[in-house]
Curated annotation (Swiss-Prot):
The species this protein was found in: Feline leukemia virus (strain C/FS246)
Protein name: Envelope glycoprotein
Extracellular side: 2-436
Cited Gene3D superfamilies: ENV polyprotein, receptor-binding domain (3.90.310.10)
Paired cysteines (S-S): C95-C117, C109-C122
Glycosylation sites: N11, N26, N237, N272, N277, N304, N344, N360, N380
Length: 436
């Protein structure tokens, strides 16, 4: 099975999970490609902590006489309003557990029981006076702003953002981090994972029998009796005709033969409307070997969208490589010298996460495949480039002498006949083609 286009749009959901309670702390969904669907994630610290930061508090009346009461109340946790408010004042730091080999050399960062922060230098992000940072970790975690000053609700917001390394990482499975409060004494630990769930917009086609095979029928013949029946007037002695209810019949499913004939007829109509002199005496032949389609480069006006429009959500059913494109049209990206002949006009694209939607009935032919939309994030981070095309069936145009030679015993001309595809003859004059 061919690899999907990197410009394909998916429904991407990012999930933050509290590891200690195995509960979902946050889920954020968006439409985008696997290259640009990296939103800013928001979660409250208490959703990562739950009840795990609630140390046992001794009742002073139950303390044995002579014992020293070190603390009458904890100053962190999520049980009470006071604890949540006090918790806002503590710095915190975050240590990765997904790649222990990438930590500082000679430093043992421990395991989950240490929050992966068994030694200083293991922390890669956080909100603390020493500004923990990293050049290789996948996320940054900072304190957000809370509109709830009373802390009756959630008032310890955290903001997670993906780094450049995180956008380039493989997210086939969840990745774990440990978060610790920086305080005198023991620094409490919260463990959380970040995972990505990807689903296609278009439901996948079920495997099974080829549905085209039962439709292998020859082209149907036109009925010759329809006009005769319509001109006959029934003989009757009745003074008024009887009303007969209309008979409704469902549309008849045409066979493969009719589909192929319709494809050639549509090509003929397009050619006849463009250059009727060429259709006076010719043969149009549908190519029976792949590639069955070809792309004709055209100039057109695409739309620039910040979010993928509905036209971007479909996956092209046709397959086309850049080598099957001819003509000259609009190119996007950095086009290598080997393909610059396809470009009548070249644009570098746009910065940021934009989607360039091809006009209705057209596609972008990229060196990574066919797509209705270009993700600028993919284009800017890869060596991909694209050409705006119309998609046409490969129907060849022949002079009548070329076909006659197949039935004659001897060749009736000396020079090699020239065969062209109809798409090349039209040169992309009809926006949208006939195969789109």
């Amino acid at each position: 099975m061919a690899n999907p286009s990197p410009h394909q749009i998916y429904n991407v959901t990012w999930v933050i999970t509290n590891v200690q309670t195995n509960t979902q702390a946050n889920a954020t969904s968006m439409l985008g490609t696997l290259t640009d669907a990296y939103p800013t994630l928001h979660v409250d610290l208490c959703d990562l902590v739950g009840d795990t930061w609630e140390p046992i508090v001794l009742n002073p009346t139950s303390v044995r006489p002579g014992a020293v009461l070190l603390s009458s109340s904890p100053k962190y946790g999520c049980k009470t309003t006071d604890r949540k408010k006090q918790q806002q004042t503590y710095p915190f730091y975050v240590c990765p557990g997904h790649a222990p080999s990438l930590g500082p050399k000679g430093t043992h960062c421990g395991g989950a029981q240490d929050g992966f922060c068994a030694a200083w230098g293991c922390e890669t992000t956080g909100e603390a006076w020493w500004k923990p940072t990293s050049s290789w970790d996948y996320i940054t975690v900072k304190r957000g702003s809370s509109p709830d000053n009373s802390c009756e609700g959630k008032c310890n917001p955290l903001v997670l953002q993906f780094t450049q390394k995180g956008r380039q990482a493989s997210w086939d499975g969840p990745k774990m981090w440990g978060l610790r409060l920086y305080r005198t004494g023991y620094d409490p630990i919260a463990l959380f994972t970040v995972s990505r769930q990807v689903s296609t917009i278009t439901p996948p086609q079920a495997m099974g029998p080829n549905l085209v095979l039962p439709d292998q029928k020859p082209p149907s013949r036109q009925s010759q009796t329809g006009s005769k029946v319509a001109t006959q007037r029934p003989q009757t002695n009745e003074s008024a005709p009887r009303s007969v209810g209309p008979t409704t019949m469902g549309p008849k499913r045409i066979g493969t033969g009719d589909r192929l004939i319709n494809l050639v007829q549509g090509t003929y109509l397009a050619l006849n409307a463009t250059d009727p002199n060429k259709t006076k005496d010719c043969w149009l032949c549908l190519v029976s070997r792949p590639p069955y389609y070809e792309g004709i480069a055209i100039l057109g006006n695409y739309s620039n969208q910040t979010n993928p429009p509905p036209s971007c959500l479909s996956t092209p059913q046709h397959k086309l490589t850049i080598s099957e494109v001819s003509g000259q049209g609009l190119c996007i990206g950095t086009v290598p010298k080997t393909h610059q002949a396809l470009c009548n006009k070249t644009q570098q694209g746009h910065t940021g996460a934009h989607y360039l939607a091809a006009p209705n009935g057209t596609y972008w032919a990229c060196n990574t495949g066919l797509t209705p939309c270009i993700s600028m994030a993919v284009l800017n981070w890869t060596s991909d480039f694209c050409v705006l095309i119309e998609l046409w069936p490969r129907v060849t145009y022949h002079q009548p002498e070329y076909v006659y030679t197949h039935f004659a015993k001897a060749v009736r001309f000396r020079r090699e006949p020239i065969s062209l595809t109809v798409a090349l003859m039209l040169g992309g004059l009809t926006v949208g083609g006939i195969a789109a």
